């Protein structure tokens, strides 16, 4: 990892090989639910809408203590050539501002609830709204959200709940990682995050520590099957583990496949402190992980797509979930000598948490439910051909060539030694004969 070398130059200006596939959920029984003839919303997956994630590494500094500090920035760019669906299509979706704010105020006093209900009635806010796909992703606002963000900015710090806008709005952080030959087993794992040894999301250091975490662009070197990798994605709000699954062959190289376990979002059974529920809150069912600290305290939890491996009682609160382990699980394929990921795929679903909102008449039918908002898949589809060629030379060609070259050098060295000994012996023999010849010459001569 030095300027001018291929690994550094590839990392500093990474090729755009990460695709973001966004899936949103459309409410298909909008009229029936609004008129009360049906009490459970039916969701239909719409997508994918495909974006390319642009990654930028800037302000790069090599530190004297064997670390590298840089600022990482990510943004999503729509790819028209890869899409068949229009961003102008209409959706029927939950009113995130109304449901989120009533859930946030679920424990408020009677007077707060009364005043809020008056505001909602005056603005004619409904629990379901019609909106374009583009606005749902990038520009989701309404009069209630604008009003609240101005009146109580400490409680409502944003006036735009576009889901991709919330993910990428503040996706710029300073990261310090270990590099150098003395850090093989912790190569490119975090030492500091925004100048601290913790993320700042959790009060418990076990959940909040940055140690061993990696952003997934590179993993540590000399990866073994016994290693547990630690992947950090900001919108997951914590580090998630990856475990060895099997050996594979990728691009002609021997690789290891690590997977994200299906119980990743399950709470620990031993009673230890978990990283899935905020202190003081009622624990979420298995398969749901709190992410509100990463989204301005907006009540949201993460899960695997379509509630895969989530408590069935949660899945049955809505219609339309179709979990598929093959489609919705995650993995990464790594070349173990260098720790370079050759391919990776991971899915995550964001769900709105609606607490007991019986005190708010427009939304009381949503009380104590988890409503899927969207799910996205991050797919690193490969690495550039020049990097493939370099990797193949380093991990396949070079070891074999090294053995042959070493053998040739041994033969050459032995031959040169033999020639040297032979020449030395010839010179020594000539010297002896010359001495004998001079010693036997007649004195008269």
Give the location of each predicted region:
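Extracellular or lumenal secretory-pathway regions
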Residues: 1-254, 260-445
